[in-house]
Swiss-Prot record:
Highest taxon of the lineage: Eukaryota
Keyword Transferase appears in the UniProt entry: no
Descriptive protein name: Agamous-like MADS-box protein AGL53
GO cellular component term, pick one: nucleus
Pfam families: SRF-TF
Region Disordered, residue ranges: 151-171
Source organism: Arabidopsis thaliana
Principal place of residence: nucleus
Length: 287
């Protein structure tokens, strides 16, 4: 048991020693890396100062202090030049110091402000362009009817010059209107004529013809078969065959008269069935 316990203690001690050695080795390696990184940064900073003074043709100095506040290194290596530049900078006014001083936070803030100003300018320009576009669109809408009128006038002028014998559009429209109205008027006149002829035929079918005898002053009624033919032919034959002793009364066509009273007074005792030798035709309406 004692031997086993001693072996365990030895192993624990060896493990602790190994871990401590590892920690020391790690710390030494980290410090070595830090020193190398710092030395590389110093070289880079001094190199950038040299490039800046050469390219911009300005006075640049670098003063490098340690953690304890001791001066470690300067650039340029001549400390008199560095002291002269530091004194000149300290004698400047606060405004001049701000102009010649560059801070990262101030630089970023200035960049952000410049970006916002640029965006504001872009927005203002966009608004002005949109307003100008609206004005142009309104003017275009106002000029569109005038453009259509001018194009219509030009087309009319071109058509008149190409075909001088063609009538103007106004005459063509009047002719078309007349072509539409003439059939309507002719149709109306034809219907009126048909109505007049039909009414005349109806009236003729309701008219009786009477012959007047001057000798015995009596009337004689012509049969219906005789009254149905053309009365103008009958009157023409009577006018050519009769002498001047027989007077032809005027033809009377009363429209649809509902009376049987004769138009000319006659003797009520005259012989109606006896045909006279000479007679004048008289017409009376009947139902």
């Amino acid at each position: 048991m004692d031997s086993s316990m001693s072996t365990k203690k030895k192993t624990k001690l060896s493990v602790r020693n190994q871990t401590c050695f590892k920690k020391s080795s790690l710390s030494s390696s980290s410090t070595a890396k830090k020193t190398t990184n710092l030395s590389m940064r110093e070289q880079t900073m001094f190199k950038k100062a040299l490039e800046l003074s050469t390219l911009c043709n300005i006075d640049v100095c670098v003063i490098y202090y340690g953690r304890d506040g001791k001066l470690i290194k300067t650039w340029p290596e001549d400390q008199s030049k560095v002291r002269d530049m530091a004194e000149r900078f300290s004698r400047l006014h606060e405004r001049e110091r701000c102009k010649k001083r560059t801070n990262l936070s101030l630089f970023l803030r200035k960049k952000i402000l410049d970006d916002t100003k640029l965006s504001e300018k872009v927005l203002e320009m966009e608004d002005s362009l949109e307003s100008g576009l609206r004005v142009l669109q309104d003017k275009l809408l106002l000029l569109q009817p005038e453009k259509n009128q001018t194009e219509f006038g030009q087309t009319r002028a071109v058509s008149s010059t190409t075909n001088p014998l063609s009538p103007p559009p106004s005459l063509i429209e009047d002719h078309r209107h007349q072509q539409w109205t003439e059939p309507l008027m002719s149709g109306v006149s034809n219907t009126e004529q048909d109505l007049s002829t039909s009414s005349l035929s109806q009236n003729q079918s309701r008219i009786s013809v009477f012959l007047y005898n001057h000798d015995n002053r009596s009337f004689y009624q012509v049969p219906d078969s005789v009254s149905s033919f053309d009365q103008s032919a009958l009157l023409g034959e009577q006018g050519s065959g009769l002498g001047s002793n027989f007077d032809l009364p005027p033809m009377v066509f009363p429209p649809q008269m509902q009376t049987q009273t004769p138009l000319v007074p006659f003797d009520q005792f005259a012989a109606w069935n006896q045909a006279p030798s000479f007679a004048d035709p008289m017409m009376f309406p009947y139902n």
